[in-house]
């Protein structure tokens, strides 16, 4: 049990970190001011990645709604390959995942994909890709190239 000091009226221990509290407020204000610009940038990066991959990989499938989704996240199923194998092939150029961190070694179909009606074959090729506010067009293009190359290498070897 922790007890507060007199300056906290005995309610909580420690003293508030005023500098960090003020910094958090400033950071929140700056984030709010750039929200529209950031969302627009994320959307442009995500869509460039999606359209580039779709143009290079036949039968690539989007998992989720085409319009009602986060501006920074892309969840795709790469046909005829394991998502895990695809990412292993592209690991030098792309940091991505095939599932949540708590299930990173589990190859079972995720409950979310199953609820969406995605079958096991399509789910096996599922990969989640995300962009950030600092992501550049060049980085997206390198990721597209690496994923396309990895898909062709894995798809033709199976």
Residue spans for each PLM region:
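Conserved core segment of the aminotransferase class I/II
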Residues: 1-36
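Conserved C-terminal alpha-helix-loop-beta "cap" of PLP-dependent enzymes
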Residues: 74-128
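Cofactor-pocket helix-loop regions in the catalytic cores of large enzyme subunits
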Residues: 56-59, 72-75
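Structural signature of PLP-dependent enzymes
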Residues: 28-51, 60-70
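Hydrophobic C-terminal alpha-helix "anchor/cap" residues
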Residues: 53-54, 90
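Glycine- and other small-residue-rich loops at beta-strand/loop junctions that grip anionic moieties
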Residues: 13, 20, 38, 75-76, ...
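PLP-dependent enzyme catalytic core of the Aspartate aminotransferase-like
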Residues: 104, 108-158
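A general structural signal for well-ordered alpha-helical segments in protein cores
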Residues: 18-21, 46, 50, 71, ...
């Amino acid at each position: 049990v922790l007890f507060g000091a007199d300056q906290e009226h005995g309610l909580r221990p420690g003293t508030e970190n005023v500098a960090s509290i003020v910094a958090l407020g400033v950071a929140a204000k700056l984030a709010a001011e750039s929200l529209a610009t950031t969302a627009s940038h994320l959307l442009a990066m995500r869509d460039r990645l999606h359209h580039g991959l779709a143009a290079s990989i036949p039968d690539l499938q989007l998992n989720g709604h085409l319009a009602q989704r986060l501006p920074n996240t892309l969840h795709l199923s790469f046909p005829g390959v394991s998502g895990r194998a695809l990412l292993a092939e592209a690991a030098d150029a792309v940091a991505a995942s095939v599932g949540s961190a708590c299930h990173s070694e589990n190859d079972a179909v995720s409950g979310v994909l199953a609820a969406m009606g995605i079958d096991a074959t399509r789910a096996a090729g599922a990969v989640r890709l995300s962009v950030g506010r600092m992501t550049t067009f060049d980085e997206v293009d390198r990721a597209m190239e690496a994923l396309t190359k990895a898909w062709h290498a894995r798809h033709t070897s199976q």
